[in-house]
Amino acid sequence: MSAQSLEVGQKARLSKRFGAAEVAAFAALSEDFNPLHLDPAFAATTAFERPIVHGMLLASLFSGLLGQQLPGKGSIYLGQSLSFKLPVFVGDEVTAEVEVTALREDKPIATLTTRIFTQGGALAVTGEAVVKLP
């Protein structure tokens, strides 16, 4: 999507369910073997009571949205802030959303709000991405 066709307020979304296999694969790739994500017996002893999805695995959905949908192919991820508000449990479905909030006039750069919602609609992750447009 070109800079000329982007508008403030445009959104893109995708939904995904992260099961135990995806969480284990991410643990292996990231070297984050925290038992809070992988061990139901350990997680049962915590405030969460069951395994939670890695926050960065959730945030990886933003990369897919930005690179494939909005702005799309050829865009370059320049930065991302994140705030983790609620846990997402292994096996739960989430919806990731990006929304264009600003477009620079002097350069092909967009700022987007990034959010992940739980299957119940609560805000689990929020942040802001800066992307160079193709």
From Swiss-Prot:
The keyword Flavoprotein does not apply. Pfam families: MaoC_dehydratas. A (3R)-3-hydroxyacyl-CoA binds at D32, F33, N34, P35, L36, H37, G55, F84. Residues 5-119 form the MaoC-like domain. Changing S63A: 100-fold lower Vmax. Disulfide bonds: none annotated. GO terms for cellular component: fatty acid synthase complex. One of its GO terms (biological process) is fatty acid biosynthetic process. CDD domains: R_hydratase (cd03449). Gene3D superfamilies: Hotdog Thioesterase. It is an enzyme of class 4 (lyase). Coiled coil: none annotated. The keyword Lipid metabolism applies. It comes from the Bacteria. Keywords: Fatty acid metabolism, Lipid metabolism, Lyase. It catalyses: a (3R)-3-hydroxyacyl-CoA = a (2E)-enoyl-CoA + H2O. SUPFAM superfamilies: Thioesterase/thiol ester dehydrase-isomerase. InterPro entries: Fatty_acid_synthase, HotDog_dom_sf, MaoC-like_dom, UPF0336/Enoyl-CoA_hydratase. Homodimer. Catalyzes the hydration of trans-2-enoyl-CoA with a chain-length of 4-6 carbon atoms, forming the corresponding (3R)-3-hydroxyacyl-CoA. This is (R)-specific enoyl-CoA hydratase. It comes from Aeromonas caviae. The gene is phaJ.
